[in-house]
Amino acid sequence: MEKSLQNENLSINVNSFGGALSSIKDKGGLEYLWQGDKRYWSGQAPVLFPICGSLRNDKAVIGGNKENTMPRHGIDRKREFELENSDLSIHCTFLLWHNLEQPIFYEDRGK
């Protein structure tokens, strides 16, 4: 799902898949965000959490002794975010809930 917001200067689009911006345009229609080109990089502005990049052997050690596999660029960029609320003239808020099928990568979640 894609949500659009605008004011007198800008319009933006936010995609619920990955919770990422997909467009930033000025009032004249000039696009400021990379729109993706499969020849180079089809992505746009991914949310990279809790890491940016790769881990050695794709492993993270949590709490000193708990080892989990963590994909490149973290766990959020390929997940569906839930729209909590929106006033499309001002803001929209997306939530991402813990997925029980995925390991817990950090201990302070939700505190």
For the regions a language model picked out, list residue spans one by one.
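Surface-exposed acidic/polar loop and edge beta-strand patches at domain peripheries
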Residues: 1-110
